Swiss-Prot record:
Matches recorded under Pfam families: RRM_1
N-acetylserine PTM sites in chain numbering: S2
Protein name: 17S U2 SnRNP complex component HTATSF1
Name of the coding gene: Htatsf1
GO biological process per UniProt: double-strand break repair via homologous recombination; mRNA splicing, via spliceosome; protein localization to site of double-strand break; U2-type prespliceosome assembly
Description of how the protein assembles with itself and partners: Component of the 17S U2 SnRNP complex, a ribonucleoprotein complex that contains small nuclear RNA (snRNA) U2 and a number of specific proteins. Within the 17S U2 SnRNP complex, interacts (via UHM region) directly with SF3B1. Component of a complex which is at least composed of HTATSF1/Tat-SF1, the P-TEFb complex components CDK9 and CCNT1, RNA polymerase II, SUPT5H, and NCL/nucleolin. Interacts with GTF2F2/RAP30 and POLR2A. Interacts with TCERG1/CA150. Interacts with (poly-ADP-ribosylated) RPA1; promoting HTATSF1 recruitment to DNA damage sites.
Modified residues (N6-acetyllysine): K298
Stored SUPFAM superfamilies: RNA-binding domain, RBD (SSF54928)
RRM domain location: 134-219, 265-350
Role according to the record: Component of the 17S U2 SnRNP complex of the spliceosome, a large ribonucleoprotein complex that removes introns from transcribed pre-mRNAs. The 17S U2 SnRNP complex (1) directly participates in early spliceosome assembly and (2) mediates recognition of the intron branch site during pre-mRNA splicing by promoting the selection of the pre-mRNA branch-site adenosine, the nucleophile for the first step of splicing. Within the 17S U2 SnRNP complex, HTATSF1 is required to stabilize the branchpoint-interacting stem loop.
Length: 757
């Protein structure tokens, strides 16, 4: 079987080779010569591969023979020991077959032998491609030209390449054997476009009378070339080439001189504030930022401004555009005072982070406060909002932050800034003292007839107090605003009806005499009364206090209410009048609770009616005085309500009339003094003192009325009457029209504060 198989294979192989050589179809042998004698094997066509039937898989598969394995291995370049027999058989078949034509052998190249190895460049002269040639040859140069001058000339047309090893420009000026310049040179550009630009612009140009000629450089071998002298390439050559490519970027050239670092543009300001300052009023942070921006903008353009509100050192940073601007800011602000603190200014070191993160406890407290605010009722929330607004608008040390102008006076500025609240309190006290002095000077003349018309002025004043109390939450009453500052809580004096009447009668006398200024009693509104003025005068003058005590004893014995004023002047008051005034006061208080703001305009008529009822119960001597007072009061009330619409000329005419009434009133005062002398002989000395005081006060009031009061009355009265119209109170109008020169200063400043609120 083995012999048959070998003979069959040899014949099959021979047929295949003959088919390849001659292109003919090999003859297929008989089916008997097939290697397998199985019944299921079928004869195949001569040009096809023989197949055999697989009984297990029930399919035809190519018949695997030695020839099939040999052809398979020959196609895939695989050789094994098992294929040696097939190769031997092939050689035997070649001897039998027709000789094939000889094939030309391809000589093996060194590339095929050295696959994967880098080809070494042959040592010899180099040739530069035209597309990559960026060298320019310039001839006709002046013999005295220098390398720097040549570089400056050639750099006008492009970027000159630098040597990657020496970092010098690739330019060369040729010299002869003796070292003298020949007048030609070479320049190597970075880009090909620079060569074309130099050929167009520099060719045929003249320098110092020498005509230049420019052309593309051509390199030729002259003599013998020694390859051993060629420079070796540096390992970092590629890195330096990449650095040269950066010269083509659109980057501005660096300025000459030392380059300053970026963090030198930032200024750090310390001790600007304290973190606790922002807990009560967080809006202070915006105020400090705005003040700092305004101050630092004087030194240059500000790029960024930050306040590190949680930093314990009170740090703020200001970033300028240029370092020079930051230097100017540091030089100016270092050591200056801001908000009562001496600040320090320095440049940022570039590493310190001044941002302080919020701790978990602080975050919980902040969220707890916010939750309490959200859960609070809307009414209390609105009150808090109004309180915060009012507190933010009130002048205080937190609102007085500013930079000191003179650093040399830093100590004085520090004391002033730290005692800002004390300055405000002293200002208020000075206002109070001025108003008090003004009230004492006016009291000598105005309070002589304090008893007369006391009940007449009671209603308007109390009505004005009610109007002020109603509007206290909305607009704020200026009289109440002055109470805590001046420290005059006088609730006991309000309960005394006769004393209140005496005070209001004195106000009526001020209007009659034409003294349209505010006294200390009017500054304090409804709370300043005759009893307090009695206490103040007792501290100034002991003799007046004794006279007041005697008069008070006399009132208790006789059963009549006699008012004792600041000058010690006493008035004749009947017991019947005083007995009737007390029930009238009770009736007035009940009427005040029922009246609204709309009834303030009718206060003058109601007061006149009450005066008429009082005159019925008075004696004949008092009736004359009351009648004169009624006429004068009518003129005063008409003037008070007409001043808002009258011009300045009408006010001056009214003032002249009041001056005449003041002269008449002085005569009445003399009559009252005489009556008082007849009724009581023990008080002659006090009467003489009262007359002296009256004469001195008359002179003072005459001078003030002729020179100062009428000139100053126009501006303040108009403002005060406007305020009275807005509030709708009669008492306030009367007080505004009867203030003194000293107290008008205090009230004018307080009115300004109220307007701001």
């Amino acid at each position: 079987m083995s012999g048959n198989n070998l003979s069959g294979n040899d014949e099959f192989d021979e047929q295949l080779r003959m088919q390849e050589l001659y292109g003919g179809d090999p003859k297929e042998g008989d089916t008997q010569n097939e290697p397998s004698g199985e019944a299921h094997s079928l004869g195949q066509p001569p040009d096809d591969t023989p197949y055999e039937w697989d009984l297990d898989k029930k399919a035809w598969f190519p018949k695997i023979t030695e020839d099939f394995i040999a052809t398979y291995q020959a196609n895939y370049g695989f050789s094994s020991d098992g294929a040696s027999s097939s190769t031997a058989n092939v050689q035997d078949a070649n001897t039998k077959a027709v000789e094939e034509p000889p094939q030309k052998e391809v000589p093996e190249t060194p590339d095929s032998k050295r696959k994967g190895e880098k080809r070494k460049a042959e040592s010899g002269w180099f040739h530069v491609e035209e597309d990559r040639n960026t060298n320019v040859y310039v001839s006709g140069l002046p013999p005295d030209i220098t390398v720097d001058e040549f570089i400056q000339l050639m750099s006008k047309f492009g970027i000159i390449m630098r040597d990657p090893q020496t970092e010098e420009f690739k330019v060369k000026l040729y010299k002869d054997d003796q070292g003298n310049l020949k007048g030609d040179g070479l320049c190597c550009y970075l880009k090909k476009e620079s060569v074309e630009l130099a050929l167009k612009l520099l060719d045929e140009d003249e320098i110092r009378g020498y005509k230049l000629h420019v052309e593309v450089a051509k390199f030729q071998l002259k003599g013998e070339y020694d390859a051993s002298k060629k420079k070796k390439k540096c390992k970092d050559y590629k890195k330096k080439l990449s650095l040269q490519q950066k010269q083509l970027d659109w980057r501005p050239e660096r300025r000459a001189g030392p380059n300053r670092l970026r963090h030198e543009r930032v200024v750090i300001l310390k001790n600007m504030f304290h973190p606790m300052d922002f807990e009560d009023d967080p809006l202070v942070l915006n105020e400090i930022r705005e003040d700092l921006r305004v101050e630092c903008s004087k030194f240059g353009q500000i790029r960024k401004l930050l306040l590190f509100d949680r930093h314990p050192d009170g740090v703020a940073s200001v970033s300028f555009r240029e370092p020079e601007e930051a230097d100017h800011c540091i030089q100016t602000l270092d050591g200056r005072w801001f908000g009562g603190r001496q600040i320090t200014a320095q440049a940022w070191d570039g590493t310190t982070d001044y941002q302080v993160e919020e701790t978990s406890r602080e975050r919980e407290e902040r969220l707890r406060g916010w939750e309490a605010f959200l859960n609070a009722p809307e009414a209390s929330r609105g009150l808090r909002r109004m309180d915060s607004i009012a507190g933010s608008e009130r002048p205080g040390p937190s609102r007085m932050r500013h930079f000191s102008e003179h650093p040399s006076m830093s100590n004085m500025k520090a004391q002033e800034a730290t005692t800002g609240m004390a300055f405000e309190e002293t200002i208020d006290e000075n206002k109070f003292e001025k108003a008090e002095e003004g009230g004492e000077s006016e009291g000598d003349a105005s309070e002589k007839d304090a008893k007369e018309g006391g009940s007449d002025g009671d209603h308007p004043e109390r009505e004005g107090g009610e109007g002020c109390s109603k509007k206290e939450n909305e607009e704020g009453c200026p009289e109440r605003a002055l109470e805590p500052e001046e420290g005059n809580p006088q609730t006991e004096a309000q309960e005394n009806g006769p004393e209140r009447e005496a005070r209001k009668k004195s106000k009526m006398d001020y209007e009659k005499n034409g003294f349209s200024k505010e006294s200390e009693d009017n500054d304090l509104g409804k709370e300043s009364e005759g009893e307090d003025s009695l206490k103040k005068e007792s501290e100034d003058d002991d003799s007046e206090e004794e006279s007041e005590e005697d008069s008070s004893e006399k009132q208790s014995q006789d059963g009549s209410d006699k008012e004792i004023e600041e000058n010690g002047v006493k008035k004749d008051v009947d017991q019947d009048v005083s007995d009737k005034e007390f029930p009238e006061d009770v009736e007035k208080e009940s009427e005040e609770n029922e009246t609204d703001k709309s009834e303030f305009d009718e206060g003058s008529e109601r007061v006149l009616d009450e005066e008429g009822s009082e005159r019925e119960f008075e004696e004949d001597s008092d009736e004359k005085e009351e009648e004169g007072d009624d006429d004068e009061e009518e003129v005063v009330y008409e003037r008070v309500f007409d001043d808002d619409s009258d011009d300045i000329e009408e006010e001056e005419e009214a003032d002249e009339k009041e001056c005449e009434d003041a002269d008449d009133k002085e005569e009445d005062n003399d009559i009252d003094e005489k009556l008082f002398d007849d009724s009581d002989e023990k008080e002659d000395e006090e009467d003489t003192d009262g007359k002296k005081d009256d004469d001195a006060s008359d002179k003072v009031f005459e001078d003030n009325s002729n020179e100062k009061l009428f000139d100053e009355e126009e501006g303040p009265n108009e403002k005060l009457f406007d305020d009275s119209d807005e509030r709708g109170t009669v008492g306030n109008v009367k007080e505004d029209g009867s203030q003194s020169t000293d107290s008008s200063f205090a009230l004018s400043s307080s009115d300004d504060d109220d307007d701001e609120v």
